[in-house]
């Protein structure tokens, strides 16, 4: 285990909760930071706080409501439909979100004496979000180090994993049922298996089914 501290960018969803369990295995001290950017469902912040409390992790919520004013999108405006038109980014994409979240997480991390930042962004199940790409994370890591003259390391344990492989990682961390029943991935604010219809729920369900089938096949051999 690394004896240093880490800050996890935390939404209370499948990916960031898996990352929180991963970080607790990797680092001696872990803190979670959640951003309030005017999400259409407030349960995300409540779920994140509940999970952090249950896992005994210090939790900070930062006000990023300005982001919702600057970048109207389906995650902050109920009147905007969740959809993706051919050749366009999904309406769930929030311009600048990961750029700002990671920048503010870095400021918090430095104040806490932590240099490790963990985020659940993933390029494999790429939804067209440019700020989930590995090249962006590496670029921002360099920029933050130069901007604050501090040796940050941004960790992306899910970057090259499919959703099925992310479920597998949660299982290996002993957190499969926890992640399955207590996290909030659904764009419509439904905990656990969600609404089953929004893009986030469909991706989550398909990944879980693929992993459970694979796991059953391995056991049957």
Curated annotation (Swiss-Prot):
Cofactor descriptive note:
Binds 1 zinc ion per subunit.
SUPFAM superfamilies in UniProt: Adenine nucleotide alpha hydrolases-like (SSF52402)
Q: What is its EC number?
A: 6.3.4.20
Q: Keywords in alphabetical order, please.
A: ATP-binding, Ligase, Metal-binding, Nucleotide-binding, Queuosine biosynthesis, Zinc
Keyword tRNA processing assigned: no
Describe the function of this protein.
Catalyzes the ATP-dependent conversion of 7-carboxy-7-deazaguanine (CDG) to 7-cyano-7-deazaguanine (preQ(0)).
* Quaternary structure (record): Homodimer.
Which protein are we looking at? 7-cyano-7-deazaguanine synthase
- What is the protein's species of origin? Geobacillus thermodenitrificans (strain NG80-2)
Report the gene name. queC
């Amino acid at each position: 285990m690394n004896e240093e501290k880490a800050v996890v960018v935390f939404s209370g969803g499948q990916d960031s909760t898996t990352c929180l369990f991963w970080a607790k295995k990797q680092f001696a001290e872990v803190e979670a930071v959640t951003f309030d950017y005017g999400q259409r469902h407030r349960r995300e912040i409540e779920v994140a706080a509940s999970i952090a409390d249950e896992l005994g992790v210090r939790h900070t919520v930062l006000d990023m409501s300005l982001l919702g004013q600057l970048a109207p999108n389906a995650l902050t405006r109920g009147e905007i439909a969740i959809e993706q038109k051919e050749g366009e980014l999904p309406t769930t994409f929030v311009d600048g979100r990961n750029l700002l979240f990671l920048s503010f997480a870095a400021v918090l991390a430095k104040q806490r004496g932590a240099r490790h930042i963990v985020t659940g962004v993933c390029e494999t199940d790429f939804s067209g979000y440019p700020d989930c790409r590995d090249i962006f994370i590496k670029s921002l890591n360099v920029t933050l180090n130069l901007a604050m003259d501090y040796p940050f390391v941004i960790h992306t344990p899910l970057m090259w994993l499919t959703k099925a492989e992310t479920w597998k990682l949660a299982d290996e961390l002993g957190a499969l049922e926890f992640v399955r029943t207590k996290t909030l991935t659904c764009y419509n604010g439904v905990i656990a298996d969600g609404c089953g219809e929004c893009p986030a729920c469909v991706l989550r369900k398909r990944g879980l089914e693929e992993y459970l089938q694979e796991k059953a096949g391995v056991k049957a051999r």
